From Swiss-Prot:
Coiled coil, from the record: none
Boundaries of every F-box domain copy: 91-146
InterPro entries: F-box-like_dom_sf (IPR036047), F-box_dom (IPR001810), LRR_dom_sf (IPR032675)
UniProt name for this protein: F-box protein At4g02733
Length: 301
């Protein structure tokens, strides 16, 4: 009598297939478990984990916690991938713009919105990789999440399309004191307080950047025509002036709330950035504001 068994089968392969089916069944039961007002899934998790962690030594408990976190992290990642696939299918059917027009639309939105769109689905992510989308990089709405790495990545993506860069926190609190606020202390002589602190501490945003945050502009700065920097706190002059000197095609420069000396910046612009049409420099620690519009230049002390 001939055997009807599959010649390619083996106890090991059969065991693996059974384990996969068993695992699929467990996960399917978990994710399809119906919601019930009388049963809190969260409370069930707590009860099960508390019970499991109540026995065994510390090393076993640690392994259980790590294993649980890892497996639910895998479930979360898998859910996100499946959700993105569904979104890609939906958007590919309902999105009526061709990729060329989509790229143009993406190039008109702020960079935070661009990143949110690119995370929606693969189709939008592919469009968001086009350098034209980074023609205008505006990170003012994402200041809490921006650091050297993010800035460098976006500048690299822009390739030769970069023309405008906005960085920092636009709505950061300004300084209410000017340079004329301190002379009254002369009247008090030696009786003046030994310690005096005026103004606000630099915004927390500045701590996300290092001295080298603008270094990529040494290579791509000549592409920029507009550069706006807001409230980055204290900056090293040389680390700022060297990249700025590469921005020879700037026509619009705005620096607000950055504690650097303004005079060296003006001297550098006079030498290297002769195309400037609009210039606004504000430094509350010096109590000075410089504005240049076309051929008009004036100083507010």
């Amino acid at each position: 009598m001939l055997s009807t068994e599959n010649p390619n089968s083996s106890p090991l392969s059969d065991s693996l297939e059974f384990n996969e089916r068993h695992l699929d069944s467990i996960i399917s039961s978990l994710v399809t478990f119906p919601d019930s007002p009388s049963l809190s899934i969260s409370s069930s998790f707590d009860r099960v984990l508390d019970h499991l962690l109540s026995s065994g030594d510390v090393s076993v408990q640690d392994q259980l916690v790590d294993r649980t976190l890892e497996r639910f992290s895998l479930l979360l990642q898998s859910t996100k991938r499946c959700s993105q696939k569904r979104a890609t299918l939906h958007n590919s059917i309902s999105w009526f713009l061709p990729s060329e027009l989509t790229v143009k639309v993406f190039s008109m939105v702020d960079t935070k919105s661009l990143m949110q769109a690119s995370a929606c689905c693969t189709m939008f992510n592919n469009c968001a990789m086009d350098p034209l989308c980074y023609f205008h990089i505006d990170l003012t709405k994402a200041f809490k999440h921006v650091d050297d790495r993010v800035l460098r990545t976006l500048l690299n993506r822009s390739g030769k399309q970069l023309r405008s860069l906005k960085l920092g926190r636009v709505d950061a609190p300004g300084c209410l004191f000017r340079s004329s606020c301190l002379p009254p202390l002369i009247l008090y002589g030696n009786n003046a307080r030994r310690a005096l602190k005026l103004g606000r501490d630099p915004p927390g945003l500045g701590s996300l950047f290092t001295r080298s945050c603008f270094d990529p502009l040494k290579l791509t700065g000549n592409l920029l025509t507009s550069l706006h920097i807001y409230s980055l706190g204290f900056m090293n002059m040389n680390s700022f002036l060297d990249p700025l000197s590469a921005c020879s095609n700037l026509t619009d420069l705005k620096i607000v709330g950055v504690n650097v000396l303004l005079e060296p910046i003006l001297e550098l612009l006079a030498r290297n950035c002769c195309l400037i049409e609009h210039l606004f420099l504000d430094n509350c620690s010096q109590g000075k504001t410089f504005t240049w519009w076309g051929f008009l230049y004036f100083t507010v002390a």
